[in-house]
């Protein structure tokens, strides 16, 4: 029983660790989703900006203005590249957090299984004690009835 108390304390700690690992994993997943959205927005902005440049080009673009468009598009490309690199790093981190969470989950389940094993063992021991008491009662009852029957038989023989 005292060992179960200690195991329950360990189980509580494991649950807290698992919850914290889960929160970290979810946070990273949300970061990945945010970066994917940002990249999509930058790419959409780039696409729209190129469309604007093409429209202006049809009506005539100066060399300076064309260079300005190209420089800005290049900046957008660099931003998207850096965000994709960060996205890959975040995806790897998210997978690490997922693996860590799964390990914490296994740790908790091991303690729960051990507690369940102890509970089943105690239950079996209790059933054995109850069966022993029942057997002792049956034997004592049989012995008492047998003695009474023997006394009746002796009295009957004496008559």
Spans of model-derived segments:
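Charge-rich amphipathic alpha-helical interaction elements
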Residues: 1-159
């Amino acid at each position: 029983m005292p060992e179960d108390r200690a195991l329950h304390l360990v189980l509580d700690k494991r649950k807290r660790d698992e919850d914290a690992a889960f929160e970290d994993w979810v946070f990273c997943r949300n970061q990945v989703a945010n970066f994917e959205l940002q990249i999509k927005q930058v790419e959409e902005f780039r696409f729209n900006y190129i469309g604007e440049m093409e429209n202006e080009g049809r009506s005539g673009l100066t060399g300076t203005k064309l260079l300005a468009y190209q420089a800005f598009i290049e900046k957008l490309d660099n931003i998207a590249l850096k965000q994709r690199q960060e996205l890959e790093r975040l995806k790897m981190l998210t997978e690490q957090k997922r693996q860590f969470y799964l390990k914490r989950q296994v740790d908790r389940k091991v303690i729960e299984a051990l507690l369940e094993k102890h509970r089943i063992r105690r239950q079996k021991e209790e059933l054995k004690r109850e069966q022993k008491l029942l057997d002792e009662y049956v034997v004592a009852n049989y012995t008492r009835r047998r003695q009474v029957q023997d006394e009746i038989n002796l009295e009957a023989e004496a008559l």
